């Protein structure tokens, strides 16, 4: 085999050297998080942080399954994403799906924190009365006669009923105070209070004390109670842009009968409206997820820990989430 001519070797050397030196900047750009954009210009990539509270949830990005959450690992970070719009879908069998459209900007990380509500949550009716397991028996002429005792009120039913009464009184006080704060001219001198300020009284405060809720008519509003510098993404539009301390969460055509935070969440609110109880997220990026918890006739609710107590007409239902 004859050796390659010197001229040819030099040619290959120069070509390969040129390729090598051209590739170095491209590799540096790539390692620094830059990619070739749609307009053939270099753009810095971003990422998205995704969290699902339920283990066994399937996470989809633009229709492609990218992860399934485990018992301990419930969050996932996707990096090296070109700027643009992405759709996130999180689903789990027997739960309502959660979806969100997220915009990724250059060098920014977007957040998508889901909530998943069971389609058929466990529930049981709290009886009004304690039924006698064994009715009293007396012997009459060799025959057994059964005597029924007067039904005894169920203490648990009465306790829960009193909680609903307390909730109703508290709501009426808050609504009245906020109405007067908004329209001080409506307050008569006899009912005026020297300690009253223009600040609203919050009907509910989130579990971690970060968000306050109140209503104006049928509109639900939320206020961030911590430092303005720490406003979370769900008080902002897009990637922490146009952030506001006070935002409107929901505007109902019907009366909102009950209002509270979803257990353990600062960013999910539960409302009773029309014939149902629903969870709605504060995050208004499309789509603002709205998931049913209970459907009945005319329900009210209170929350104790992770238990929902629903009062629908005379019935009280205990629902575990």
Language-model features and meaning:
Residues 226-228, 282-285, 321:
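Short loop/turn segments that connect beta-strands within beta-propeller blades
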Residues 1-196, 218-219:
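Short loop/turn and low-complexity linker motifs enriched in small/turn-promoting residues
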Residues 156-163, 171, 175, 191-205, ...:
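Repeated scaffold domains used in trafficking and secretory/extracellular systems
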Residues 302-321:
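Blade-level signature of beta-propeller repeat domains, shared across WD40, Kelch, NHL, RCC1
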Residues 212, 268-269, 308:
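Hydrophobic beta-strand positions that form the internal "hydrophobic ladder"
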Residues 55, 95, 217-220, 274-278, ...:
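Loop/turn residues immediately N-terminal
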Residues 127-130, 229-230, 285-290:
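Predominantly a core beta-strand signature of beta-propeller blades
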Residues 231-249, 288-295:
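Beta-propeller fold detector
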């Amino acid at each position: 085999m004859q050796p390659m001519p010197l001229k040819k070797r030099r040619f290959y050397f120069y070509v390969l050297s040129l390729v090598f030196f051209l590739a170095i900047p491209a590799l540096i750009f790539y390692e620094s998080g830059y990619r070739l954009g749609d307009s053939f210009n270099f753009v810095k990539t971003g990422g998205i942080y995704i969290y699902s509270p339920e283990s066994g949830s399937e996470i989809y990005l633009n229709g492609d399954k990218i992860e399934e959450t485990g018992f301990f690992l419930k969050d996932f970070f996707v990096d090296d994403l070109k700027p643009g719009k992405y759709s996130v879908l999180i689903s789990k069998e027997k739960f309502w799906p959660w979806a969100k459209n997220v915009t990724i900007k250059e060098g920014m990380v977007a957040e998508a924190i889901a909530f998943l509500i069971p389609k058929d949550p466990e529930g049981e009716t709290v009886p009004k009365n304690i039924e006698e397991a064994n009715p009293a028996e007396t012997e009459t002429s060799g025959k057994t006669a059964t005597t029924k005792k007067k039904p005894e009120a169920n203490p648990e039913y009465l306790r829960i009923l009193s909680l609903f009464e307390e909730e109703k009184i508290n709501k009426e006080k808050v609504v009245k105070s906020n109405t007067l704060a908004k329209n001080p001219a409506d307050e008569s001198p006899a009912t005026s209070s020297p300690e009253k300020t223009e600040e609203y009284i919050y009907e509910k405060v989130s579990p971690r004390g970060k968000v306050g809720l109140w209503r104006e008519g049928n509109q639900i509003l939320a206020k961030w109670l911590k430092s303005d510098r720490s406003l979370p993404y769900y008080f902002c539009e897009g990637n922490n842009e146009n952030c506001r301390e006070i935002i409107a969460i929901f505007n109902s055509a019907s009366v909102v009968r009950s209002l509270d935070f979803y257990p353990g969440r600062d960013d999910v609110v539960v409302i009773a409206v029309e014939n149902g109880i629903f969870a709605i997220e504060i995050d208004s990026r499309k789509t603002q997820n709205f998931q049913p918890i209970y459907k009945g006739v005319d329900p009210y609710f209170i929350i104790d820990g992770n238990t929902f107590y629903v009062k629908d007409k005379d019935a009280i239902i205990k629902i575990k989430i």
